[in-house]
Amino acid sequence: MGTTPTTATAIEVAGLDCGYEGRAVLKNISFTVARGEIFFIIGGSGCGKSTLLRTLIGIQKPMAGQVSFSGQSFSEKDPAMRVKLLKTFGVLYQGGALWSSLTLRQNVSLPLEEYTRLTHIEIEEIAALKLAQVGLTGFGDYYPAEISGGMRKRAGLARALALDPAIVFLDEPSAGLDPITSRRLDELVLQIREMFGTTIVVVSHELASIFGIADRVIMLDQGEQGIIAQGAPRELAKTSRDARVTEFLQRGDLLPQ
């Protein structure tokens, strides 16, 4: 898939239990993500993909275990380190999470205003650059309601890239998009990895994206409350002896040859 990931570790998850209201949804989750890797978290509805993502980015506190970024533990016990680490990754939420009352340029500017001491002119220049990097040159003064769903996803991605993060998390980026628009977004994700060496973690159930751009995946299962498979998706589809894995990856007409 383009740039070869390095052997250096960008994310390490060890013995993670996560859930809500005192109930564990996932138990003993352990995996690593290499720098520059496009890594997918996959599985059926209700398996805990979004719960795991929220725990990785710090929205939810883990019930047990540890998440580390480049060897540094992401812990609420160290607020200064937590803020430092928050600056090293960007997030594209499922709906794009753009403020409807702000233009695209203003939306992309928000992280820069929050986390940097750049001047207004510098922030404007960076926001325009990030919009250009996702193919939205000339759309800075548009509001989210004035553009298509695919363009809103691109604008959300531009905001996620505003601080030049080492890691970007994408939550169901293809949701609500037609197949052509979804494929174009996949191509953009590949371009971002190629240009910047960004580590990209994607929550998805879309087979076209899984087979199209993922270097490796972990598959979650609701019944197991954990990981039931991990590896390259094409290899898993061909060689896994777990019916849950093959049934998920061999849906539709996208079985890899």
Where are these regions (language model features)?
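Helix-to-loop junction immediately C-terminal to a conserved catalytic motif
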Residues: 57
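Conserved ABC transporter NBD signature motif
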Residues: 65-74
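ABC ATPase NBD coupling module
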Residues: 74-90, 120, 236-240
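Conserved ABC ATPase "signature" region
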Residues: 120-139
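Conserved ABC ATPase signature
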Residues: 143-147, 151
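A short, proline-enriched helix->beta-strand linker immediately N-terminal to the Walker B motif
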Residues: 162-166
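Catalytic Walker B motif of ABC-type/P-loop ATPase nucleotide-binding domains
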Residues: 168-171
